[in-house]
């Protein structure tokens, strides 16, 4: 059973002067910091459960980022430093005839003012294989209701550099001190008022894979202001494996406003050389909505799948169920 302990960060200096000693006052905090602390305290009083947990996660992330940012200069973190895309999620999934799988994921990106807002710190705990190869979130094992590989779930951290809106570089470590690097190019082409194509190419390096690449492309059509159809495909190959691993999703996404989303997806995935056209095929229904304010979201997934890992195994069938909570910070 996984337990979460809130991490409190207490900072302050207490100076006690002797008789005749000079007393040096600490620098006054910036007005923006005072307002932020006051607002956070008010939120914590109004919500004594979820808001303190969210503040603890965010404060811990900022504390780590301040330390890294101080390596590059004396500019205060409050002068442009901020957490973006912070997420902490707990997800439980199970497939028929398999043991349930509980996973905890954490991801955050923090902009560093001492690097002129061109670089950011990224850190988290996730499927390191998907992180290194830059798999689209919608095609992750979790979102396809596939059991996690515990050996691939690990902490990671590093620095990212945004050279251009379309070009980013990352260098970091995962699973202890295993280095990796990747470069991502992305571009979007509007094909009219209702259609759009998104392309993403990522080149990555690890000591085990050597050079590899992940290509992802999606086509979206806005059927109406609340209904979108999307076809998403991704494929990964490395110098070590020399075989494509691919996945695809064709789905309809109906928005009901206020972050309420209903989706129906047809999913398939495969591996070159497996002897079968697709190693996993399935249909999946998903509902997502806020459960507390606009930053704590819940989701429920139900799917039916037909896996076949290789040509020697008959295609079987299995129901799958997943439920999760995601906190944005």
For each of these PLM feature ranges, what is it?
Residues 34-165, 170, 318-319:
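Transmembrane beta-barrel domains of Gram-negative outer membranes and organellar outer membranes
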Residues 107-109, 156-160, 184-186, 216-218, ...:
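Outer-membrane beta-barrel architecture
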Residues 238-296:
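Intrinsically disordered, low-complexity segments enriched in Gly and acidic/Ser/Thr residues
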Residues 301, 315-329:
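Outer-membrane beta-barrel "beta-signal"
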Residues 100-104, 151-155, 177-181, 209-213, ...:
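Residues that define the transmembrane beta-barrel architecture of outer-membrane proteins
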Residues 77, 93-99, 144-148, 170-176, ...:
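Outer-membrane beta-barrel domain signature
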Residues 86-94, 121, 155-175, 194-205, ...:
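Transmembrane beta-strand segments that form the barrel wall of outer-membrane beta-barrel proteins
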Residues 113-115, 162-166, 190-194, 222-226, ...:
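Outer-membrane beta-barrel channels and translocator barrels
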């Amino acid at each position: 059973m996984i337990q979460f302990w809130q991490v409190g960060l207490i900072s302050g200096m207490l100076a006690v002067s002797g008789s005749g000693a000079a007393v040096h006052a600490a620098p006054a905090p910036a007005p923006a910091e005072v307002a932020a602390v006051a607002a956070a305290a008010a939120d914590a009083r109004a919500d004594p459960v979820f808001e303190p947990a969210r503040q603890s996660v965010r404060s811990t992330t900022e504390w780590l980022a301040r330390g890294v940012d101080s390596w590059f200069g004396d500019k205060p973190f409050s002068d442009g430093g901020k957490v973006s895309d912070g997420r902490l999620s707990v997800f439980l999934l199970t497939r028929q005839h398999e043991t349930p799988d509980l996973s905890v994921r954490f991801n955050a990106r923090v902009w560093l003012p001492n690097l002129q807002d061109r670089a950011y710190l990224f850190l988290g705990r996730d499927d390191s294989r998907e992180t290194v190869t830059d798999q689209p979130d919608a095609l992750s094992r979790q979102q396809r209701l596939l059991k996690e590989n515990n050996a691939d779930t690990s902490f990671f951290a590093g620095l990212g550099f945004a050279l251009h809106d379309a070009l980013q570089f990352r260098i970091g470590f995962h699973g202890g001190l295993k280095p990796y690097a990747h470069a991502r190019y992305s571009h979007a082409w509007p094909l009219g008022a209702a259609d759009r194509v998104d392309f993403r190419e990522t080149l990555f390096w690890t000591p085990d894979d050597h050079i590899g690449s992940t290509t992802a492309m999606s086509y979206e059509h806005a059927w109406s202001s609340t209904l979108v159809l999307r076809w998403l495909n991704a494929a990964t190959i490395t110098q070590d494996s020399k075989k494509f691993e691919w996945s695809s999703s064709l789905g309809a996404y109906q928005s009901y406003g206020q972050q309420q989303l209903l989706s129906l997806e047809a999913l398939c995935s495969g591996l070159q050389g497996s002897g079968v056209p697709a190693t996993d095929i399935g249909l999946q229904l998903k509902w997502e909505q806020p459960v507390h304010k606009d930053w704590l979201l819940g989701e429920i997934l139900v799917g039916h799948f037909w896996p076949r890992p290789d040509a020697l195994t008959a295609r079987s069938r299995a129901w799958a169920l997943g439920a999760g909570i995601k906190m944005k910070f």
